[in-house]
Amino acid sequence: MVEVRVPATSANIGPGFDCLGVAVNIYNKFFVEEIEEGLIFEGCADKFKNENNLIYVAMKKCFDKIGYKPTGLRIKIESDIPVSRGLGSSAACVVGGIVSANELAGGVLNKKELLDLAVGVEGHPDNVNPAFCGGMTASISDNREVIYSKVKVSEGIKFCALIPDFTLSTEKARAVLPKSIDYKDGIFNVGRTALMISALNNGDFHLIKYACKDKLHQDYRAKLIENFYSIKEECEKLNSLGVFLSGAGPTIMVMLKEEDKRFSKNIKSFLETLKNKWEVRELKIDKLGTVVNNRKV
């Protein structure tokens, strides 16, 4: 049996639209074994127990590339990453499927080949890269090749995810974005993306509040998330370092000083006054990324 663990990811990190992402310590686990025949799923809803399951789709892509034909498969999922909340649940399924398939087939593909294959299936290197590699990454796609670099994050920072009880599909969140942008808005984001990376790298955490600002996606998507601005304002009042929409949303991610012991309790009290229910989870950066059979990929 192959066991694969994949972390949740938070993409964009404010201005780094479709390029920055960070892995955090929420995980999906996948247990896969080859059986005599058939396709058996455990741990997911009945509507996902078929060949359209994203994990299986990813596995098949890997098997086809390698030229391996399993006799049958049993796939068990232990999922802790909330679905359609902007925490990389799709990326985790794709990465988990591809890595487990490669392992079953004898580990034919190297890490670079696995990464390119996963991005080809999932389409978002800002989620796939940190899910694979752990930590924070800056990623681009160049002629279908995935190029990335790890971003060093100084000690002394933690994250807090505010996860609502409602979902938001990536497709819907993409649909509200404009077809084109002003030149000045592009410059606005380029500068703040550079500032974000530098501030995290050098431990200049007081600059994060400036770096979190964005003009490419967050304001458009905020309209789909009830109380987004009031929550953001409350987080800022509670001395957060920065607030941003996690991926396409609706999860709101907050950066905090590691020694901050009061934020979670105070923001939870505020969220309880709102109509929707919100879960508050303090998180750390996952530095390992994907782990297969207790070893790093």
Curated annotation (Swiss-Prot):
Keywords: Amino-acid biosynthesis, ATP-binding, Cytoplasm, Kinase, Nucleotide-binding, Threonine biosynthesis, Transferase
UniProt-annotated binding residues for ATP: 82-92
One Pfam match: GHMP_kinases_N
Annotated catalysed reactions: L-homoserine + ATP = O-phospho-L-homoserine + ADP + H(+)
EC number: 2.7.1.39
MF-aspect GO terms: ATP binding; homoserine kinase activity
The keyword ATP-binding is assigned to this record: yes
Compartments, record wording: Cytoplasm
Coiled-coil parts of chain: none
GO biological process: threonine biosynthetic process
UniProt xrefs under HAMAP family: Homoser_kinase (MF_00384)
Record function comment: Catalyzes the ATP-dependent phosphorylation of L-homoserine to L-homoserine phosphate.
Entry protein name: Homoserine kinase
Organism of this sequence: Clostridium botulinum (strain Kyoto / Type A2)
Gene encoding the protein: thrB
